[in-house]
């Protein structure tokens, strides 16, 4: 079938036609519009032609030339077109007859070509149709393209009508639907179907001479029935483009408009290509195309704005080769004024289809049609990057034409970048930011402009987006327009039939309609006016054709509104839903069915939320739970990245047979083949290191690639660590001394940065991980995994590294197991080994000589380099494994051209400067790694305490040196010619020292103190490790026993420290004898961040286990010399070629600019500290650089003394063994409950101290603690942690907060904050010395001691051993001594007064790189944990001890504890829970006091008829039968009792408005809450408690015999109803009523049985009048009865955040995972939102009033009868 295109014609007949025609017009439909519709008719060609053309038969060359862009389509014969056109024109003008007369028509056309334009023209200006919206080849002068007729009669300057070339021929206005033709034929009376069929026969290709009846003209446009007509699709010019391009045909896209113009005069374009309609009939729809004429003024045409069409975006995509999904198979939906294709995530289909329940025609979901809902997250979850379908904006943005620039086709929006599921961009809301539906509308107009804007030119108006203005000198281009050359307006929207306006008010009205419609789309609504038919999209709408209304376009939503305010409100609802979806939740309102039968809220008609994350079934109804649950998933993801899965006590463990399931929080290792289970996060790091060591051993720790080691039987288990991912690079906040968040780089940027300096770079983050934890890990984690140094075999996914890589590290993944590792490490290549790319060619990168990558003999020095690449992030065991492979002869000649880096000292990982252009040299390329500045090495941790990886402090310092670049050995040399010497030449000093260390590698210092026994060695018959590899300490009276080398080295280190370093040392390591020859300290501003500064700064990280630094023990002289020499680095200019300065800037060494002192980093005021949580941040202070020491201080004196303590550990330090008792298996500990009874450990011998530990490094710290306490006591104060019993009666802080006591005689002052110590001490001094005490200089009085005390108390508790004694003399040192190095300043030599506590931040020591800021358990924070003593109320059961509790899941399985308190029954593992649970009982005791009793859910309360017994944790009032599950009601009920006590004490009884007081004629009965006096013979009634007191005093005066005060006439009988006289029964009745009704709480449980006269009803709230008259005179009394809990709560509210930062002794030792959830039920009963207070009567709902809860008078308590 063809779409025939009529030639342009000119009709001289009057446009109005004959008078009878005008009478037949319907609804004001102008004949010119009808003629325009009929000017281009679609007719049916012969069946054979239609079939061949539908198949796209090839054309002859001549036909191809004539067809222009529509190649492949044949043309209809000219004569047939002329005949058909003549018939139509004659018929429209009423002149049609049986005989066709095409020739006169053609002749008339030819004769009238030179006449002025009159009659009917097919003219269209630019901007009036979507042909020119995105014209594919706009002409340079923006004029309309011309065409000549095929006979060539028209000349080039002919101004007559002509057809367009290219896209102009194929365009048919989509607004002319079949319904228009039906209306037209009906207007002419052709309603009979037979008549229409006859008309179809008259004008058809089967009868080329035309028929004899006028019906022929329209029959081809009519469907067989009205139903098919309504479902028929309409087509525009672009749909044919899309069809042709999808079919693989080529469309010529002329590059220049001028070329198209040239062709326009020579080519004649054929008819439109064939299109296949969705209808089954052979009829085609009417299509009318307005042909353009050249405009009189191209400038005026440029002022018209082209409309953007919905199809331009798709044409742009098809031109670029992209595919479009079919819509409804091979058919297309009906285009309309609502650009539904540009609406994001709507399900679209043909009109009339779909489910009405789903919101009409656009909500039906099919597999082929439409897009997923914006809420449909589950359908698009994929862990890898996915291609997101493009989502254009809701409304096409119009193109603006300016006179100076021709209109150009608007490029389609680029498809968005690939996003993974968990990126928030995927679900960004498409809701508009428009304020209102009416935004942008106009109310008044002046000359086509808004009144507030001046007219720029006459032709410019704000309506040009929708309406075009034509002046009197312009031709509008519409052939039937009767207002040619008169000022008028046309709508640019074909949907509006290019409606014409002459009134500016009509223009405003029409513009406002379009603006509101577009705004509605922006807000997600379709706007329909009364003239619009919304049934096409929303059939069955009751507002259709009645009023303006808005339909919500969201999938599944069928809301319709008539008010714009309702529209905005509904939009906010969808916005909230979208935000919830972005957060991973879905909300179901009370009227919505969540469809989840196992949901706890299913069928409850309540608003609730579901978590949408895979595998999570969590449901909740409180919004406050959203953030909590989000944090749960964040933690879960972090644990999963570390290889663990946490299960909470309230969830069932997925591991079968787990004894911790639903009992306590615990962890499972989810590595393949590992079944380790633990309860404390402190075990996580050690277990992680265990897998690490095992993996390194199996993957080639000795330098062999994994591919050369051969497969092992345990390969699956050994490689299970592939799933481990360190979380370090995801959270810079917790890498204390690393980089700031701004220095983090994505994996893509890391790969890009690495590619700049390497020959081959493969960003490994694009490869999906082969996760073995797929069942437990959330999807989408791989997208957030950073590049890192992955030590594994080549099969390890490089996106899941094990070792943490700091965010500023510049290299991409380097799989150590790959064969090309050694070459890539030495050349700086960043390769990623994958199963299909073994990275064998990686060693080619850089200019270095290739190394023997595939050889079995690997240079041992490369092992050092590989291990140092992770810098302190591997364990000492791995370091020694690598050291075992070292050969002293394996060295490189620096001058041989080979890479000098792998010599004894590995290179510093310093980023290359970006401006170092060109190919990096051998030295530069090897430096493309960044510096690691972590606080501590997690892998060097044992039992939560960081220790040095090697045996001595010399080893620690040598580690720092070993991580330096070999080009930086001038930093360590005392000679100053390093600046001029070649950077790659190692200094003689370094060569000698390192050579000595390597040669002495076997003389490890632990051999001095310990002896190793192998599996065949016999040590002792009673040794626990007999016939196993272990170590015995040979020091007298020690007897320590170790099964690992780690423990042996640590123990030897302890002995070395305690014995003053007297172990034999090797004198070969000759160090410089003086520091005077070194250059002055490097100025901070001399270099951005010199590598030398980084070498010294890297000491902050903690010792890296470099194998070359294990051996010899130093002498004291060497210590002092080395400590004073190493940090003093000569300044190296940035011009040194092989020393590129590091761009490491973000809050690191460059911006902090610390001055390196001997063993210290000094920070000036306002310098950003490297430690993000440093309590002295932005102040003048010092950080210790020795080993793992975390000491920080504010004075240079303390810094110097602390440094000396490191250099000489025996400096005024008594032997620690004199103050501790050591117990081992040979000498068992006398304490049966000691935690370390079966191991070697120490007990403190101080009186009253129960400290016990098996970690020797804690002993000096503990001594310091005692000395600190002694100094504090000398100043008159004592400190207690919140876990210590202070013993002072009435102390409100006892076991509640860490606090201080003044221990001066007669002073009971207790306080929380350390700075109060100074002010309180000054108060005592003023009392002793008088008011003038303040004038005493601080240096001469006790306040200086206080300053020293407070300042010293803020030092790190994790300071090095040996610092204890120095603290006692800090006052003298700080005032007298001069710091080492020429850095003496006044600020460094004086003691600063402590500032406000608000400026003191606690310095948490980060334990790992998790995103939760986990705090390492410093020795002080684990005080109670290490003391080994049992808290009162608990009992410990050893591993093989039967607890004889049948309900205990831990019995005979693990060491555990039982709470022995009444009605508790809590059982747990791990001592941490003991202190938390004890605090829980303290809170509960403060809550229940002596008038309530608490019962856990697991225990029976033994109260009859209690529904909570054994099911819920609940409370029972001991004064009445009230019970509740909500802890907040306990206090309220207690206040109620207090109020009732006050009422009873005043001699009154309360009755609520719902309780019958049984007093005849009481005017308050059953009306409001009131009170009756219970005094015998008194009939007084009051409504407020304020009146009770005066009435009570009157009775007291009567009892004393005083005359009553004058009163205005019988005030006693206010209601005249109380006639009790002195009867005994009356008083008994009121007292009984008071007893039965006065104790109502939350439930109103029935009290004792009452007499028949005392019926009890549920209480009601008092009336407003009664409430207004009440007062709170009993507030004080009620508060007093509330107990001490409220007082303590109020005081706790006043506590600042630093409530007890002293000594860090009060640091919470609870694990991070335990802080969120209390043990078992801890606070679930203290902070619940349950509404269960067990009301026993319906009327009891109003029992408690806010006034009663506040302590004021409430309603009289009653109980249900």
Swiss-Prot record:
Chain positions with Phosphoserine modification: 719-720, 981
Predominant localisation class: nucleus
Biased composition annotated in UniProt, kind: Polar residues: 1-11, 160-173, 896-910, 1363-1394
Tissue: Expressed in the brain stem and the thalamencephalon.
Gene Ontology cellular-component terms listed: nucleus
Flavoprotein among keywords: no
Name recorded for this polypeptide: Zinc finger protein castor homolog 1
Keywords, in A-Z order: Developmental protein, DNA-binding, Isopeptide bond, Metal-binding, Nucleus, Phosphoprotein, Repeat, Transcription, Transcription regulation, Ubl conjugation, Zinc, Zinc-finger
Biased amino acid composition, Basic and acidic residues: 77-88, 136-159, 925-939
Zn finger spans (C2H2-type): 550-574, 609-633, 667-691, 1031-1055, 1300-1324, 1457-1481, 1515-1537, 1571-1595
